[in-house]
């Protein structure tokens, strides 16, 4: 089975429908218990410059050589597309280990361009270790040393005392996020790929899709208090359609990573349906999500090698026309803005409510609701056209002890009571009333309005 995002092409035509702002059936169009006072709509775009498709360690590569697709003209094309879509925006560039070290004139020019973009536009330039999958392929200590050396090289490359405000990692273990904060002075890490499982080279479902401070126990667990607190804001890397994201890999012939990324949308569905899904997914956060949470956050990492520059320009233009107050800023700037309003996780209370868009894997007759806080995450699914009762498809408790793998391996998820992917015998959807009395009390203490829907 081809697990890669790029290798999956969905042949069927899509007939997606725009997502309307919906009133939460939990009675929650009032803003949830606020994550401090952060307000607004925020979009971050990351472009990756690399040599090999997946540089899992400094000395090991998986996948194809992409040097031809990362040449300077491709980098210029990407920046021009971003500027057409958002002339006053700032973006983040993530450069790989091999791209930092490659002596070919094309990569010398690429590095010069990235430094120029920082000085001219205020773009952020940072490091991407392990081709998104550093913990899956290398030890914590090796990754720490690699991060340290690469960040020093980037400071030298950009000059002027420059220091990145974040690390773009795909996945990054808790210990190395602690090192970023304490040793490198970096307090933002794109450190998880929310809901990713059975796709590409690493699995990591179980976390929160909006910012949080990770626990020393596990990078997907929000810190519970001072004892396990890591002062590094952990960010998701790709905003996905929540209904598509509940699936495991390509189960049922659908792509669980479908959202605002071009591979899973335009690449699989065609320009019309694909762009519609990109906007529908954006609306989940900038319409309903912003109303529920006080702010909306949409993010995606687009490798320079994949192209789709016209789709990037179109999407950014469409976002600015529909939500003109959107702030298009760097990854580090967004994380630090959230950090400014949140000294810890005590006010975490994110809520999301999506009715399907009609794109493949996002069924129009289904509604999914997510509740995410420091103590647990809860997902409810039901057929809203029939008035079916909500079923719990995910209940992950964060008050329980968690432990990361001790050595490199593929599986870095955090699963306990019920997980949305349905990969274990216990992952069967149930009514809230079928959970243990203790778990019901835990849920109702946070969301008493769910009692009538149990």
Predicted features along the sequence, with ranges:
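Active-site-adjacent pocket scaffolds in enzyme catalytic domains
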Residues: 32, 164-290, 343-360
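N-terminal export signals
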Residues: 7-28
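Surface beta-strand/loop "capping" patches
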Residues: 340-382
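N-terminal secretory signal peptides
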Residues: 1-4
């Amino acid at each position: 089975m081809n697990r890669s995002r790029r290798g999956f092409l969905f042949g069927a035509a899509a007939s997606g429908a725009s997502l309307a702002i919906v009133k939460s059936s939990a009675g929650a169009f009032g803003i949830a218990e606020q994550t401090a006072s952060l307000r607004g709509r925020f979009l971050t775009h990351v472009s990756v410059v690399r040599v090999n498709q997946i540089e899992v360690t400094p000395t090991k590569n998986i996948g194809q050589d992409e040097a031809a697709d990362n040449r300077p003209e491709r980098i210029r094309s990407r920046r021009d597309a971003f500027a057409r879509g958002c002339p006053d925006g700032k973006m983040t560039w993530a450069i790989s280990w091999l791209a930092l070290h490659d002596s070919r004139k094309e990569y010398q020019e690429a590095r010069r361009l990235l430094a120029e973009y920082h000085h001219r536009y205020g773009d952020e330039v940072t490091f991407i270790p392990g081709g998104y999958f550093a913990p899956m392929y290398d030890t914590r200590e090796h990754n720490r040393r690699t991060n340290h050396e690469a960040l020093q090289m980037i400071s030298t490359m950009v000059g002027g005392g420059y220091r990145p405000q974040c690390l773009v990692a795909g996945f990054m273990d808790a210990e190395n996020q602690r090192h970023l904060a304490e040793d490198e002075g970096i307090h933002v890490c794109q450190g998880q790929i929310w809901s990713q499982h059975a796709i590409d080279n690493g699995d990591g479902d179980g976390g929160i899709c909006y910012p949080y401070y990770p626990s020393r126990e596990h990078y997907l667990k929000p810190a519970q208090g001072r004892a396990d607190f890591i002062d590094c804001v952990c960010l998701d890397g790709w905003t996905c359609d929540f209904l598509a994201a509940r699936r495991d890999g390509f189960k049922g012939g659908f792509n669980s990573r479908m959202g605002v990324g071009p591979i899973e949308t335009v690449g699989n569905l065609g320009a019309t349906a694909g762009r519609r899904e990109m906007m529908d997914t954006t609306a989940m956060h900038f319409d309903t999500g912003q109303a529920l949470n006080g702010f909306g956050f949409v993010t995606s990492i687009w490798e320079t090698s994949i192209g789709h520059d016209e789709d990037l320009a179109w999407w950014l233009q469409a976002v600015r026309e529909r939500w003109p107050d959107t702030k298009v800023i760097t990854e580090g700037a967004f994380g630090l803005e959230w950090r400014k309003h949140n000294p810890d996780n005590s006010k975490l209370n994110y809520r999301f409510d999506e009715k399907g868009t009609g794109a493949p894997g996002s069924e129009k007759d289904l509604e999914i609701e997510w509740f995410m806080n420091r103590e647990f995450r809860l997902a409810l699914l039901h057929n809203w056209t029939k008035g079916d009762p909500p079923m719990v498809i995910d209940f992950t408790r964060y008050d329980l002890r968690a432990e990361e793998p001790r050595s490199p391996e593929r599986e870095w998820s955090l699963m306990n009571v019920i997980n949305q992917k349905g990969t274990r015998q216990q992952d069967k959807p149930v009514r809230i009333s079928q959970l243990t009395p203790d778990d019901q009390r835990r849920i109702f203490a946070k969301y008493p309005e769910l009692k009538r829907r149990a």
